[in-house]
């Protein structure tokens, strides 16, 4: 009993020495700490977003094998963009890159972009090819991407000027060759007959896959082509050298290639928004606006959802690899802590000008963060 009384006296003495406790003050201190923590988290996320955007710019140039962003003005883009059905279809299908992360898979992408469609505009050849004393259209230089992929389709697109009366048009595509003994300078590729009605001009496509494959096998045989589209009166309706008001009506080649799909594996993670108070590793939304960055050379998409990872990775949280937690338990001082990083990324499709003013439609791997985790 005496021991109990002694303990009570000691406890009361300690309370008196410590002085009165202000519960409101403790509550305010706790609230300030919480606010400071949230503020620090917001600042950290903002810095992470800025770093992510800069990293995306570097990755795009690297994956497209570009040392610098192509310097193409908006006026030049208006002149170079073909006003043709295949390009319009590619542009029309673009919205902000859709967020499709529900499958929970992790794509094993290669680093560099994989090309799906290449639109090649005519250019000047290394030599001046002339027939009957006049330069002939057209000569096409091909990207190295075409040579190392399987060509599944190659279309030559030509624009035919409008006619005033109904007429039949005879279209002829000729391949220029080295002069033969009999003086022949070209050989036929395709011929077709079209019926045109008065009104607007039309785009016509011609299959040139076989010719393209031959050119890729024997590049020295690529001397260019000649395009003719004669009406019943002998007038050439094909736009080969665009005149005033004919910007975007140049002939061009549309080449499609294919790539082998890759396997995937399963993974999961947390999703948050900018107002989230989640402290753990989480995926946050981030939209990259190429127009705001001044990258007019990217035709589409003008913006896409890139997302980013941010948050803490304590060892009590689920690790990407089971051995990570085991190693830390065995040697907690010798192992570095895990980082919040993407565990699932997906590609984006992009339509853009390369450094040679060719229009490329390709797939760039690992540009969208779909899942985040600690590893």
UniProtKB/Swiss-Prot annotation:
Gene Ontology MF term list: cytokine activity; growth factor activity; heparin binding; identical protein binding
Alphabetical UniProt keywords: Cleavage on pair of basic residues, Cytokine, Disulfide bond, Glycoprotein, Growth factor, Heparin-binding, Secreted, Signal
Intrachain S-S bonds: 272-282, 281-340, 309-372, 313-374
GO cellular component: extracellular space
SMART domains the record matches: TGFB
Sequence intervals crossing the membrane: none
Source superkingdom: Eukaryota
GO biological process terms held by the UniProt record: myoblast migration involved in skeletal muscle regeneration; negative regulation of myoblast proliferation; negative regulation of satellite cell differentiation; negative regulation of skeletal muscle satellite cell proliferation; positive regulation of lamellipodium assembly; positive regulation of macrophage chemotaxis
Compartment(s) of residence: Secreted
Post-translational modification: Synthesized as large precursor molecule that undergoes proteolytic cleavage to generate an N-terminal propeptide and a disulfide linked C-terminal dimer, which is the biologically active molecule. The circulating form consists of a latent complex of the C-terminal dimer and other proteins, including its propeptide, which maintain the C-terminal dimer in a latent, inactive state. Ligand activation requires additional cleavage of the prodomain by a tolloid-like metalloproteinase.
Pfam families linked: TGF_beta, TGFb_propeptide
Annotated site residue numbers, Cleavage: 98-99
Subunit comment: Homodimer; disulfide-linked. Interacts with WFIKKN2, leading to inhibit its activity. Interacts with FSTL3.
PANTHER family: GROWTH_DIFFERENTIATION FACTOR 8, TGF-BETA FAMILY
Family: Belongs to the TGF-beta family.
Function summary: Acts specifically as a negative regulator of skeletal muscle growth.
Name of protein: Growth/differentiation factor 8
